[in-house]
A protein has these predicted regions:
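Bacterial N-terminal signal peptides that target proteins for export
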Residues: 1-4
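C-terminal motif of bacterial Sec signal peptides marking the signal peptidase cleavage site
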Residues: 11-14
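Short, low-complexity, disordered segments immediately C-terminal to signal peptides
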Residues: 16-39
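Alpha-helical segments in soluble extracytoplasmic regions
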Residues: 39-123, 127-177
């Protein structure tokens, strides 16, 4: 029993004069006293910016929705100018607030793709005659063919990116409704 008494003394008194660390105080919970922050609705400026993105998409896509087109040099130039309008319009719109930054990033990427398409259409127009023709089998014919393919592909890619931006904007709009 003497051994048991020594063990109890050690357990209660600590070892070799060291004191046990005091037990930590229970953590206070402030959840009940502080209300959860609510999301503020989008501002009128943010909503206007979202509307401007939708309008931009329609403006850029409009010339490409024709049921048929004759690819004259003027038409190639018109298509290039329509694609180039994305970057100009985005600069005019300016950057939105922080909540719409993911949308802004997507629109910026779309405008970059569309600008590449504009350069492709300009290249195609530069090797074409007034009615859009080139001499078959020439370097100009190959450049025109590649450039037109490039322009239409870039338009499709840019339009898809703008659609993605509109979807992201709709999700953000719903989140802050």
């Amino acid at each position: 029993m003497a051994g048991l008494g020594a063990a109890v003394l050690l357990a209660v008194g600590g070892c070799a004069g060291h004191q046990a660390a005091p037990a930590p105080a229970p953590a206070r919970s402030t959840a009940a006293s502080t209300p959860a922050p609510t999301a503020t609705p989008l501002t009128a400026a943010e909503l206007a910016w979202i509307t401007a993105v939708t309008n931009l998409h329609h403006k850029v896509d409009k010339p490409f929705r024709a049921s048929s087109m004759t690819m004259t040099r003027a038409k190639m130039t018109e298509l290039g100018n329509a694609l180039r309008a994305c970057g100009r319009e985005l600069r005019r719109m300016g950057a939105p607030g922080t909540r719409l930054q993911p949308v802004y990033v997507k629109v910026t990427k779309a405008c970059q793709a569309l600008d590449r398409g504009a350069r492709c259409f300009a290249k195609a127009a530069s090797v074409s005659d007034a009615v859009g023709g080139t001499v078959a089998g020439t370097v100009e014919a190959r450049i025109q063919s590649r450039s037109l393919s490039c322009g239409f592909a870039a338009q499709g890619n840019g339009s898809n990116l703008l659609s993605g931006a509109e979807e992201r904007a709709a999700a953000i709009k719903a989140q802050f409704a």
